[in-house]
Amino acid sequence: IDAVFTDIYPDSVKIGMVSSDKLICKIAEKLREHDAKNIVVDPVMVATSGAGLIREDAVEALRAQLLSVADLVTPNIPEGEILTGMKIHNRDDMEDAAEKMSREYGCAVLIKGGHSLIDAHDCLCENGEITWFYGKRIDNPNNHGTGCTLSSAISACLAKGCSIKDSIGKSKTYLEGALKSGLDLGGGK
């Protein structure tokens, strides 16, 4: 992290799955130390199967250290449930969870609805304002990694100077195009 920030200061930072509480704390410390900007945290904690991917101590480190340095946090529905302690069944629940996380961590929160069975609508809470980003479920077996791809695209747009809302809109359009074209976004499960 020091090598990157002291060589070419990044215009955005995207953090994905980090399974160690010690690493999470060190990353948060370094992001603060270097006064990083446009930090997107995709708290990868739950596999598509529903299996937990990181230990509870790492979840606690995310809550206590990393989420508070983020400008945008992008949990999916199961991750939003873990981070809020709420059940998310519908649009109102998504809004409530996004608002709760945004207040608690002082950042924008995008709850990704891709785990919903009906649609792929995402709910953003930024500065107390709710914005919905609508998306259709696209029949494509290559959907592993779509959340990571979305958060990476958002980070790239932020680096180019786009607002959070514009970054999300552009990134959803990009991801939808990739899925429609059958682009293989990953094969791991």
Whereabouts are the PLM-identified features?
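Conserved N-terminal subdomain of the carbohydrate kinase-like
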Residues: 1-52
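Nucleotide and nucleotide-moiety/phosphate-recognizing core
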Residues: 22-32, 107, 129, 165-166
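Conserved phosphate/ATP/ADP-binding segment of small-molecule kinases
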Residues: 56-130
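Short, small-residue alpha-helix embedded
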Residues: 81-82, 140-164
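Short, charged, surface-exposed loops that flank catalytic or proteolytic processing sites
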Residues: 87-94, 159-169
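Glycine/charged-rich beta-loop-alpha catalytic/anionic-binding loops adjacent to active sites
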Residues: 128-139
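Charged C-terminal helix
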Residues: 165-189
